[in-house]
Regions:
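Residue-level signal for inorganic ion chemistry
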Residues: 31, 42, 65, 157, ...
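Active-site glycine-centered loops adjacent to acidic/histidine catalytic or metal-binding residues
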Residues: 8, 42, 226
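Short, structured coil segments at secondary-structure junctions
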Residues: 56-57, 65, 173-177, 236-237, ...
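Conserved acidic, metal-coordinating active-site core of Asp-based
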Residues: 107-222
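Mg2+-dependent phosphoryl-transfer enzymes with acidic/Ser/Thr/Gly-rich catalytic loops
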Residues: 1-4, 21, 193-276
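Short hydrophobic/aromatic-enriched beta-strand-loop microsegments
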Residues: 58-66, 180-182, 242-244, 258-260
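Active-site phosphate-binding/coordination module
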Residues: 16-126
Length: 276
């Protein structure tokens, strides 16, 4: 019986700045050959998928952590943050040393305070590679300045702020208002990197929408992930598979815990589930 397979990218298919292991690439291709459908399910925007990931070959994907759902090159659904919530968030974000980017169908629009955030970050003991990645994140040429933002609906907000007190202040200000996820366990950087989203815009609801479109049930879905923005996906899918490098909270909700992503975890899990 055909299954719908959903794969997070960072920390699941590969670590940031790294390519997926050959075992994962071959296993996903074999699963598709065996009649299953494979989808990305990532916090990344459609325009920021690494080429090495795209080359694997997928039937579609969930992007911006549930903001967009696509089959092939066609976007089927878009789920936006409530405008009232967005306006409230912008008031908070503008009052803090937080660099942020609004993710929309027309691109990512960033605040213009990257230099301030970098100046406030503790750079002591930071490696050259970590500093390079920090600058690539804050000064990504793929983003557009906030002055060009025209009020387009927003899927979610990517944020970057100094670690420590400022990150704690951000969390306290937004607690109970939004879903706040960070990727500090994946990225050893002087800044905290994460996303702010409407609790109703998530990977789980996106999977439900895709299942309705395909005439499938969520029981036919198998989801692979490692981070807190994968929890709704695990609650929705018939089977949730946590990577060995996932946090304890993610592992606790999973039906299966496989090996780490760099230790052939995806290939081993697909074999264990009799999909390849």
């Amino acid at each position: 019986m055909m299954k719908l397979l959903f794969f997070d990218i960072d920390g699941t298919l590969a670590y940031p700045q790294q390519e997926p292991p050959v075992s994962a690439v071959e296993a996903i291709r074999q699963a598709r050959y065996n009649g299953h459908m494979a989808f990305l399910s990532t916090g990344r925007t459609i325009d920021s998928i690494p080429e090495a990931v795209s080359r694997i070959g997928f039937d579609g994907g969930i992007f911006s952590a549930g903001g967009q759902v696509a089959m092939g090159e066609k976007v089927l659904f878009r789920f936006h943050m409530a405008d009232s919530l967005l306006q409230e968030l912008l008031v908070w974000l503008r009052s803090m040393p937080v660099f942020y980017a609004l993710e929309t169908a027309d691109g990512r629009f960033h605040s213009e305070n990257a230099e301030e955030v970098l100046r406030l970050a503790d750079l002591s003991g930071i490696s050259e590679s970590a500093m390079k990645l920090t600058q690539e994140i804050l000064f990504d040429p793929g983003m557009r300045p906030m002055s060009e933002y025209g009020g387009q609906p927003v899927f979610k907000i990517a944020y970057h702020c100094p670690k420590g007190a400022e990150r704690a202040r951000l969390s306290a200000a937004l607690e109970g208002l939004v879903k706040l996820v960070d990727y500090d366990n994946l990225l050893e950087l002087p800044i905290s990197v994460g996303e702010i989203s409407d609790p109703e815009v998530n990977k789980g609801n996106a999977i439900r929408a895709l299942c309705r479109h395909l005439g499938m049930t969520t029981a036919d879905c198998i989801a692979f992930g490692d981070s807190m923005n994968d929890l709704e996906m695990f609650r929705t899918a018939g089977v949730g598979v946590a990577m060995g490098n996932a946090s304890d909270a993610v592992k606790a909700l999973a039906d299966l815990v496989c090996d780490r992503c760099e230790c052939d975890g995806i290939a081993k899990a697909l074999k264990q589930l009799d999909l390849i």
